[in-house]
Amino acid sequence: MKEQKLIHEGLIIESLPNGMFRVRLDNEDLILGYVSGRIRRSFIRILPGDRVKIEVSRYDSTRGRIIYRLRNKDSND
């Protein structure tokens, strides 16, 4: 059976080497996010200040996979 993952929205705070990013979730948690393969293949640029959807494992809540970059009109600010 596949592992259940939690999907959160957050803001990219800092860009780190090797496609890693520091992300502040909407619930104020600070986690380390990495870019999913689909985003990497599509050459989608993620920059500090972007809002993203991030998939977090139940077992390790300090790391997550960035699965979607929200456009300005998609964010609920």
UniProtKB/Swiss-Prot annotation:
Cellular compartments per GO CC: chloroplast; cytosol
Extract the PROSITE patterns matched here: S1_IF1_TYPE (PS50832)
Keyword Chloroplast appears in the UniProt entry? yes
Q: CDD domains of this UniProt entry?
A: S1_IF1 (cd04451)
Location within or outside the cell: Plastid, Chloroplast
Q: Which SMART domains match?
A: S1
Per UniProt, residues of the S1-like domain are: 1-71
Q: Which UniProt keywords apply?
A: Chloroplast, Initiation factor, Plastid, Protein biosynthesis, RNA-binding, rRNA-binding
Tell me the InterPro entries matching this sequence: NA-bd_OB-fold, RNA-binding_domain_S1_IF1, S1_domain, TIF_IF1
Q: Which Pfam families match?
A: eIF-1a (PF01176)
**Entry's Gene Ontology molecular function annotations:** ribosome binding; rRNA binding; translation initiation factor activity
Subunit field text: Component of the 30S ribosomal translation pre-initiation complex which assembles on the 30S ribosome in the order IF-2 and IF-3, IF-1 and N-formylmethionyl-tRNA(fMet); mRNA recruitment can occur at any time during PIC assembly.
| Entry function | One of the essential components for the initiation of protein synthesis. Stabilizes the binding of IF-2 and IF-3 on the 30S subunit to which N-formylmethionyl-tRNA(fMet) subsequently binds. Helps modulate mRNA selection, yielding the 30S pre-initiation complex (PIC). Upon addition of the 50S ribosomal subunit IF-1, IF-2 and IF-3 are released leaving the mature 70S translation initiation complex.
Classification via PANTHER family = TRANSLATION INITIATION FACTOR IF-1, CHLOROPLASTIC
Similarity comment text for this entry: Belongs to the IF-1 family.
Name of the protein: Translation initiation factor IF-1, chloroplastic
